[in-house]
Amino acid sequence: MARGQQKIQSQQKNAKKQAGQKKKQGHDQKAAAKAALIYTCTVCRTQMPDPKTFKQHFESKHPKTPLPPELADVQA
């Protein structure tokens, strides 16, 4: 039964190592993506990463609504 005990110890050691690496890494891709979405459409509440995309979205999805003042000088 020595191998069974070694296997359990190896699994515990590996789990501890994996947990340490996760803590060290500390980067969450979903959180980073969410932080990048800083522009929110006033009509449909869709979030966009930059003003150019925001203006393109607004012109294509809400053509009858007047452009917000923050998009007036943006080059699309």
Curated annotation (Swiss-Prot):
InterPro entries: MBS1/2-like, SERF-like_N, ZNF706/At2g23090_sf, Znf_C2H2_type
Biased composition (Low complexity): 1-13
Keyword Transcription regulation assigned: no
Family matches, as PROSITE patterns: ZINC_FINGER_C2H2_1
Zn finger (C2H2-type) location: 39-62
Subcellular location, principal: cytoplasm
Function text: Transcription repressor involved in the exit of embryonic stem cells (ESCs) from self-renewal. Acts by repressing expression of KLF4.
UniProt-recorded name of the protein: Zinc finger protein 706
Organism of derivation: Mus musculus
Gene, per the UniProt record: Znf706
